[in-house]
Amino acid sequence: MLFELRDVGLDRDGRAVLDSFSAGIPEGSTALVGPSGAGKSTLLRLLNRLADPDRGEIAYRSRPLSSYEPLALRREVALVPQLPALLEGTVESNLRYAAELAGERFDGEGTLRRAGLDPSFAERDATKLSVGEQQRAMLARALAQRPAVLLLDEPTAALDHAARDRIEAALAELRRQQELSTVLVTHDPEQARRLGDQVLEMPA
């Protein structure tokens, strides 16, 4: 099992944003669905150790998640947030920074292609991209780390159909090649079925 969650709870401002949640997330592609406020994005933050649970236990590859040093874990378990946050400079400089931070060999062209982008995209100014281009650049930046697991927080929520299709095509190819495991948060049940080997529904 990739991740195991046992009675996990997290409180914010005096209320439970996740309460007694238990689930197993296997290797492969898992889609998380559920109503707004169910804690889907919160769960991704917990899996990436951007937050730690107030109650319960999370295991990653049968080892307590809390035993992993956060930065070391994030090199292996990469998060693509819903809102793009690229650094100033070119797309290539963003990818190179991510690869170097993770101690990985930099392969700009290969990384861009895996994210569904043409290699010429490398010289684009990262701060002047469309929202769809930013999201694909964020996917490429996460892939530059060569993670074992990719966490995706509604990566197509703010995109038009064409941009959504490009992101989905890139994720479908990664899934087909079984390069890494993915955990995808989505409000779209159809997208969950298209991109998930397993669909995990989180209760309200």
Predicted regions and their residues:
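Helix-to-loop junction immediately C-terminal to a conserved catalytic motif
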Residues: 48
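Conserved ABC transporter NBD signature motif
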Residues: 56-64, 73
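Conserved catalytic motifs of ABC-family nucleotide-binding domains
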Residues: 83-93, 102
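Conserved ABC ATPase "signature" region
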Residues: 105-121
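Conserved ABC ATPase signature
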Residues: 125-129, 133
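Hydrophobic anchor residue at the start of the ABC signature
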Residues: 139
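Catalytic Walker B motif of ABC-type/P-loop ATPase nucleotide-binding domains
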Residues: 150-154
